[in-house]
Every structure is written in structure tokens, then in C-alpha cells.
Amino acid sequence: MTDLTTLTIAQARYALTKREFKATELTEAYLKAIELANPTLNTYVAITAEQAMKMATESDSRLARGQGGILEGIPLGIKDLFATQGVHTQACSYILDGFKPPYESTVTANLWRDGAIMLGKLNMDEFAMGSSNETSYYGPVINPWRKKGSNEKLVPGGSSGGSAAAVAAQLCAGATATDTGGSIRQPAAFTGTVGIKPTYGRCSRWGVIAFASSLDQAGPIGRNVRDCAILLKSMASFDEKDSTSVNLPVPDYENYIGQSIKGMEIGVPKEYYLEGMASEIVELWQKGINCLKEAGAKIIDISLPHTKYALPAYYIVAPAEASSNLARYDGVRFGLRVPGKDAIEMYENTRSAGFGDEVKRRILIGTYVLSSGYYDAYYLQAQKVRTLVKRDFDQCFASGIDAILTPATPTPAFGIADEKIKNDTVAMYLNDIFTVPVNMAGLPGISVPSGLSSTGLPLGLQLIGKPFAEEVIFQIAHIIEQAIGTFSTEKWWTQQ
């Protein structure tokens, strides 16, 4: 019998409706795969086996009655940033030690409504702050990919490293993730998976632990473009509990997969050609351009002049919002509490013990740029830059451009505890150079696998769309996927 964990969501969904196997069998197959792989890859921080089997049994009952939802019986991994009622939810931080929320996030509630099954909670950078999944309280996630002829452990990207690695290693059919500055698209590119950051406001943020509220957005990571389209249809919704949720109909994204892109205008921004960029990234970009040309799209050279200021502005805006959001973690009502002689000392002791180094760094930066005397010089200026970045995109799309094609990352995955990057915070932050402008402008962006590096590691291209036009970038991404193919890695962890 076929290994059920190799099936895409679309394939598994079809087979389940035809009763070729049961949801309980599919779920068991994933739980066995997790049991075998997790000690090595560290993708899950909580495995909800009992709950998963209960949900699968209920799915089988609905399927037998012909009443299944669009994700009926599909086992998913959930990033540890999403509140799951009565289940471990810690944002992979010690400060939320033991926290089990009494409520469910809107995104996960939508998935359960449509019949999906929860396998467990996925590892991530602490409070989603990181680009390598090395800041987690539970230790780093190991990328399932390896360089040719090497046993070096590589990062899966971040902050949704657990989500991307679990999908790439076939430890879930798909996964939820979040993206504040590239945290879906960068790990997807590093692991040969597909990840989409929807338009800001497309998915509800209610029940998603906040990092930077004006930038955070939930989205899926899947094995291919179609799977991501299926997942986003379920995850997206209007939600009165989220004041930034936008009340627009959610298209059936899957219907756009396979449609022609003939006549579409694809912009290629000159500012994304970075000085000293690896030649294989430039070649990959050209390969993507050629694919789209052959499919009948028009390639237009464009300029996004303020893009170069997006990253420094982001690292002012995001920490500022984080320092405000994370002030609520004080040990009083939930999570870790470290005693002190009075309330102030208790707050200090709790935060000192509970937050990791990267989170502390960003809180310090954020508090500094919001402080008296520096607010106008830093935070206000960064918000003005943000407006200019968004205006560049608006003008580009107003001129008739349908989507923009760029690389997803400046490099393939790097080593765990890479000394050069570990000791250079700016080098780590530069991993998000191609993805951050999309968050600053609130636009949708998708990362699609587009080839392998000279060392055999996945590389990705990014498509940026108009606001609430996710269906267009799904359509174009599928053309690239069809031309270049999908990529998977050997399961070396099963032979250890």
C-alpha cells in the first residue's frame, strides 16, 4: 500500500471521499511518521495523538454519511502561535509555560469546521521573532534538507520553521503559519514547500499571539500550490472579533489553478537585483521570468525606489509594536511566575527568566524608538517610509501590472549556529530583505519552489499581488510549479 503520508491534500481528500482508506488510517500514518522523525527534526513541541484520533473518527462518521467538509479527514500541524482550546499554546516561549487557552483562534476554528484534524503544535521562533527557528525555547528545528554529500544540520528558516519542516518531511498534510516580515515565505523557500502570506486582513488575527499587530498575518504552508489554495480557502474569513479583518468574499482559490496567464503583465523590480547577489539566485529569477514568458505573460521592468528602506523601517516598526504587545506578559495571570519581594521585582524576575535573548533585544529596540526624544526621529520616520513603500506598489499596480516576480530569499538554507550569522544580528535580519516590503505594504505574497542550489538545496521565487488578489498569484505560481516541478528530500532521519 502507498505510504499515505506522501499524498498531497488534494489527493488525500479525493481518496477519503472515495473511501479508499479511512481518516483514522491517514492520521495513524502521520502520527507514526512524527514519532519516528521528531526526536531528530524537532518540528513538534506538542503531539495531540489522542485528540487527533478522536477527530479522525468523527471525520470518518461524516464521510460515511457523505457530509464531509472541504478538509474532512486531513491531518494538519498548527504553529504554536495559534490558540488551541485546552491545548499547549506557548509561542515557544518559557514565559507562557503551561498555558492552555480557554478559547480557539478563528483560523483554527475555521479549519476544524471544515473537518481538518490537529496532529499537534509546531515549533517556531519565540514569539515569531527570528529567521532561522533557533530562538525557540524548545530548541532549533532541523531542516529535512541536507547539502549534497554533507551531514551538516541546516536551519529551516523562521519564524514558521516547524511548519515548513513538518510539511517538507511529510509529518503533516499541511500547516498553519504566520508572516510578519517573511515568516511564511522564507521557510517555505528554505524547505522546498509553498507558502502564502495573504493580504493583511484576509485571515483573522483573533486568537493568534501578537508580535507586531499591523504586520502579522496568518497563512498556510503546503506541498504544492493547489494544497495552499485549498487551505487558504478554509483559513480566510471575515471576523468581527478582529478590527482589522476585511469583510470581502473569499474566492474558491482552487478554481484558479490551471487557468491561463496569457496577457498578464508581470513586473520585475530593478531594486531587487542586489549588489553581490549569488549568481544562482539571479539565474533562478531569470528561469522564472522565462517560464512566465513562455506561458504568454508580458514581462515589464519596474522600479520600487523605496524598497531599500523597507528593511530598516521594518526593524523599527515591528520591535516598537512588539514592545507594546509583550508588556502583557508579567506573570500575574498566566504562564511563568518568578517570585520577588514586591510586584515590580516579580515582573522583572519573570520577564528576565521567561523571555529569550532575541525577544529581549527586540523589546529593548522597540522601547527605545518609542521613548521620549526618539519617537519622532525613529518611529515616526519609519511610518513615513512605510507609506512610501506602499505608494510604490500602489503606483506599480495602478499602471497595469498584475503581479511582481522576485527571489524569495538571497541565499539557500544556512547551518544551525552558523557563526557568521549567529554573531551578526544584521546578517540574520537581511534574510528577510525580499519579503519585508510585502508586509510593510500589506500585500499578498507567495513563495514557490523554483530549483535547487549548486549544493542541492531548495530555492524559491516570490510573487507579490494586488490587495485581496491572492487568486492571481496562485494562478501564476502554479504556472511556475508546472514548468519547474516540485521538490522533495530523502528521509535520511528514518535510517538513523
From Swiss-Prot:
PROSITE patterns: AMIDASES (PS00571)
One of the record's GO molecular function terms: ATP binding
Keyword tRNA-binding appears in the UniProt entry: no
Entry superkingdom: Bacteria
Top EC class, one word: ligase
GO BP terms in the entry: translation
Active site: 79, 159, 183
EC number: 6.3.5.7
Magnesium among keywords: no
Keywords: ATP-binding, Ligase, Nucleotide-binding, Protein biosynthesis
GO CC term, one of those recorded: glutamyl-tRNA(Gln) amidotransferase complex
Catalyzed chemical reaction(s): L-glutamyl-tRNA(Gln) + L-glutamine + ATP + H2O = L-glutaminyl-tRNA(Gln) + L-glutamate + ADP + phosphate + H(+)
Database matches in Pfam families: Amidase
InterPro entries for the chain: Amidase (IPR000120), Amidase_CS (IPR020556), Amidase_dom (IPR023631), AS_sf (IPR036928), GatA (IPR004412)
Protein task: Allows the formation of correctly charged Gln-tRNA(Gln) through the transamidation of misacylated Glu-tRNA(Gln) in organisms which lack glutaminyl-tRNA synthetase. The reaction takes place in the presence of glutamine and ATP through an activated gamma-phospho-Glu-tRNA(Gln).
HAMAP family per UniProt: GatA
Family, as annotated: Belongs to the amidase family. GatA subfamily.
Assembly description: Heterotrimer of A, B and C subunits.
Record NCBIfam families: gatA
Protein name: Glutamyl-tRNA(Gln) amidotransferase subunit A
